[in-house]
Amino acid sequence: MYEKERQELILTLREKGITNERVLKAFLEVERHLFIPQALHGHAYVDNALPIGFDQTISQPYTVAFMTQVMNPQPGNKILEIGTGSGYQAVILNYLGAKVYSIERNHNLYLRTSQLFDNLGYRIALRCSDGTLGWDEFAPYDGIIVTAGGPEIPTNLKKQLAPGGKLIIPVGDRKSQKMHILQKTGVDSFKTTIVPDFSFVPLIGREGWKIG
């Protein structure tokens, strides 16, 4: 379904600087409309964020593509995702061969997305907990992607990143953030690149924003 719309989305992503052919193929093959409410299916392949309920959104396709291209996951890489949401980003990473561990703090959304993964046949490790604390049981990770904007970079996530791994997280206020791309170069040392202007839902948790 929506073959023409999916091809048009790929053209849009190319125009915005997404050049990794593996990433573009993932966006062509993974059907975004399956991750949003049926009433919004007609908007699934427009380059916009969309509401998915529970005061959450599915991110703009370009944003997901940008983070995925920066991460550039290789088959077998262990990737931790903070903020499962609709599940779309996790499935993109899974399609590219990564072993994905994903954390969602909203219990109702966790249940819905867990059921969706089961229905679609995706084997993604999913947990309902405070994402700012990470998932120490399976650390270290080759990459960590945070899909919500925080006031700072959680210490636990830095600790759970493998040497040479990348941590991608939007940092700023509750309305707008800059993407921080950290590559771990030593036990406590990182090379950091910062890219403006993004807008994510707030990262709630012990090392994030408080509820309210």
What do the predicted segments below correspond to?
Residues 1-80, 88-92, 96, 109-120, ...:
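Class I SAM-dependent transferase core
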